[in-house]
Amino acid sequence: MSISQNKKSYPRLLADIGGTNARFALEVEANIIKNIEIFPCNDYNTVVDAVKVYLNKFGNPTIKYGAFAIANPVVGDWVQMTNHHWAFSIETTRQALNLEVLILINDFTAQAYAISRMSSSELIQIGGNFCTINAPKAVLGPGTGLGVSGLIPCGNGDYIALSGEGGHTSFSPFDDTEVMIWQYAKKKYGHVSTERFLSGSGLVLIYEALADREGIKSAKISPELISEQALSGKSPLCRLTLDIFCAMLGTISADLALTLGARGGVYLCGGIIPRFIDYFKTSPFRVRFEDKGRFDAYLAAIPVYVVLAKYPGIFGVAVALENHLKDYFSKK
């Protein structure tokens, strides 16, 4: 990309679209991101409606290049969100927004790209030693669903971010209690994916299964209330729910670390864990993470980091767009 082309490519439209909220921003210069706004997805019929309201708020700047991270597989032109009603054609959306270039990537691919640029002040380490340089990194995190990605080194300190749907792999129970919880979920849903438990709604599902076992008829409860009751000590059942949630996350994190050979560390993203970070440090997470029989020592050395950065998806999708535009301009 030439200097003149680079200057003319700003501002760039960035979006991180989840099942609950869509975050929008403008990259006004290289690595300078401003005007971050959060829009509830349910308030808008389409993604184009939401974008137009956002851009109108900032004077409808002329934009040629955009990138969206989305909590969904991105295969071909048509996008049907898994955890929301939005469905759209990428090309039709590009035209409706009068963009020259619009790319879409998986939201956790964006999270992974962001991690490649993070400072140590944006991370809290949970156990393990130091990262191995130029080794794969595992990236996952519970939110509306369970996002899963990874960073694979490709030389010169650069990484390729993986795009997948690891949150929808089949859940494997660790002990008798988790077998019971899995059976409860299977009766309700049939196939039980990992994100059935490792998500905001998953926390509620674990609670419901435990309450059912105890013969407790509970009123509808939110993930936030479960966390609050668990941390305050008001509800032993909520505390057990949170313990099991963190233990499950430990097992799944270890599975991903083994699959990728993630000696570069495991990175936990999303808004759930930071809400109870002090509890999480001493929760069953790390013990379960290292409980892998013959590979206990291998996992004990791998550091786990909780990501505290506020908008990693936005910063990650900016990296993806920059990479794409380098190729785009080189071919013009």
Curated annotation (Swiss-Prot):
The keyword Cytoplasm applies. GO terms for cellular component: cytosol. It comes from the Bacteria. Its main location: cytoplasm. ATP binds at residues 15-20. Its EC number is 2.7.1.2. The keyword Kinase applies. Keywords: ATP-binding, Cytoplasm, Glycolysis, Kinase, Nucleotide-binding, Transferase. It catalyses: D-glucose + ATP = D-glucose 6-phosphate + ADP + H(+). InterPro entries: ATPase_NBD (IPR043129), Bacterial_glucokinase (IPR050201), Glucokinase (IPR003836). One of its GO terms (biological process) is glycolytic process. It is found in: Cytoplasm. It is an enzyme of class 2 (transferase). GO terms for molecular function: ATP binding; D-glucose binding; glucokinase activity. CDD domains: ASKHA_NBD_GLK. Belongs to the bacterial glucokinase family. This is Glucokinase. It comes from Campylobacter jejuni subsp. doylei (strain ATCC BAA-1458 / RM4099 / 269.97). The gene is glk.
